Amino acid sequence: LPRPASGCRQGRGLPEVHRHRRHRFLAPEAEFFIFDKVRFENSMQRSFYEVDSIEAPWNSGIDTEDDGTPNIAFKNRVKKGYFPVPPIDHTQDLRDDMVANLQKVGLILERSHHEVAGAGQQEINYRFNSLQHAGDDLMKYKYVVHETAALAGKAATFMPKPIAGDNG
């Protein structure tokens, strides 16, 4: 256990901490990516991860989408994914489902939109809370985002920078 500050007996000063804690608020900006495919390996001879998003710039030259429909070239450009609308934003419906589910677990949401990275970066902001509850809110947020993406056959990740050369 940490030692009390010099000249302070064990437990003194704690009411002061609680008094300040009531007036502190926190709401992290937990941006995430939605990917259509994720592969990884960590074995004795190799380590890698590979991600793919149908809206990513590197998919502008593919012949067909994953569902077999023709590629009609609505793809984001590198660092140009901020707030696109469909058909470039392929994730709007899934993000709307995430918003609905986050509201069901009690988070008060402020905004949601596609973020700067072209390959599926998302942002859903929720209202700040006390320090006591902010950690719980973040865990609920991440759980709902992961589960909603998985139910849609996608992968959500909170990795800080999964795409080289793009925002994260």
For each feature predicted by the language model, list its residue ranges.
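Glycine-rich, acidic/polar active-site loops that bind/position phosphate-bearing ligands
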Residues: 1-168
